[in-house]
Amino acid sequence: MKYVAVGAFPDITERKVKERARARVLSVKGSSEAALWTARRLRAIGYEVEGPVEVEVSVKAVEEAVRSALDTCDLVIVTGGVEPNSAPAFEGVAAALGRALVENEEAKQHVEEYYLLEATDGAASELFPLKRARALTLLPEGSTVFHNPRGPAPGILLEEGGRYLICVPGSLAEAGAIFEEEADPYVRSVIGAYFSTTVHVMTKTWEEDAVASVVEAVSEEAPWVFAQLKRTVRSKEGWGITVTVFAKSPDEL
């Protein structure tokens, strides 16, 4: 299906579209799967991608990695480093940008709603996010919050000197959902890739490793094509592979 993003994309600050743009994916230790997925998607959109670059789980390591990336990149993605009791990614990003960590009401509401829905005892669950998941509500000042439909940790977006910086959880399922449903318009706006077409290819196997090998081969041979196994796309005989191509004009599709 081909679509134009008019009406589907948020109101993004007007900016000059770049012919070429560079992105770096910073993978906080333990989030390599999400980082690899993100790097593949960015290449398909049209970015020159550096990484994933593994970063230790510490505020200082994230701060240094983000500072370095912002020197040369138009887009920086941080995967992982956000857990209910500790969010070194948020803290490190705040330090790198020289911004304060502030309690974000939208993030707080998201965390509370997530645990209220997950809990069997509503009264007990109300205390959980406030006492044990406060790290997920303290965000760098000026953050745009991305809703996470699959977990408690929100994604965030910040703009610094005309560059975008995005943080997503380390889980592939969570990072992918945030990216596709929330972050994509911002990422694509940098290079004007407002158009896309998607097809679903049905396989005849339930072997995930076999499907993964096909996805990897497509990524290596045609990096401008974004292929992924979608567990919600399947037939009676096997998994489906979702294939998306991005473009700057309908004529390119």
Predicted regions and their residues:
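Glycine-rich phosphate/diphosphate-binding loop of Rossmann-like nucleotide-binding domains
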Residues: 3-57
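Structural motif
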Residues: 24, 55-67, 74-76, 143-144, 163-166, ...
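Polyanion/phosphate-binding surface patch
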Residues: 73-76, 243-245
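Proline/glycine-rich low-complexity loops and linkers
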Residues: 61, 71, 84-191
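An accessory alpha-helical subdomain
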Residues: 164-253
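Glycine-rich beta-strand-to-loop/alpha-helix junction loops that act as flexible
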Residues: 28-29, 48, 76-90, 248
